[in-house]
């Protein structure tokens, strides 16, 4: 039966598609790089996302961020990206964490539950390690 991931399954195989569907990916920073990563992962069939960012879409994001449109300016990036992911794959689970990753809140994230972690943080002093 054809579904939205049929072409990807032809390329990767059923076992790989099951792994994607059952994987949980944390994306720290959903602006420029993180936005495109989320888009690609959603279109590839990843099942669960944790989106971490405390920034809002602003006018200066329009030239480079996939979530930035005139309609999304002023909205929190994690909420806009959640909506976009669910528009692409309504079966995905999307957990939003409206905060920045900082040393003070590092223990708030269940790193042992993530299959993959994307570090797309734009603050050079703070990176996921």
Please describe what each predicted stretch is:
Residues 1-26:
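N-terminal charged helix/coil linker that caps or initiates catalytic domains
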Residues 27-30, 51:
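Hydrophobic Val/Ile/Leu positions in short beta-strands of Rossmann-like dinucleotide-binding domains
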Residues 33:
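Hydrophobic/small residue at the entry helix of a nucleotide-binding pocket
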Residues 43-48:
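Conserved S-adenosyl-L-methionine
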Residues 53-88:
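Glycine-rich phosphate-binding loop and adjoining beta1-alpha1-beta2 segment
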Residues 104-112:
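Short amphipathic alpha-helix with an adjacent loop that forms part of the alpha/beta core around
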Residues 126-129:
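Conserved small/polar residues in nucleotide/adenosyl-binding loops
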């Amino acid at each position: 039966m054809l579904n939205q991931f049929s072409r990807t399954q032809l390329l990767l195989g059923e076992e790989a598609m099951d792994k994607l569907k059952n994987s949980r990916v944390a994306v720290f920073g959903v602006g420029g790089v993180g936005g495109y990563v989320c888009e690609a992962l959603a279109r590839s069939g990843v099942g669960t996302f944790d989106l971490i960012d405390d920034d809002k879409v602003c006018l200066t994001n329009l030239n480079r961020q996939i979530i930035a449109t005139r309609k999304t300016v002023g909205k929190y990036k994690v909420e806009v990206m959640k909506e976009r992911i669910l528009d692409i794959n309504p079966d995905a689970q999307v957990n939003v964490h409206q905060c920045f990753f900082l040393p003070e809140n590092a223990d708030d994230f269940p790193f042992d539950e993530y299959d993959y972690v994307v570090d797309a943080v734009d603050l050079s002093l703070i990176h996921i390690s």
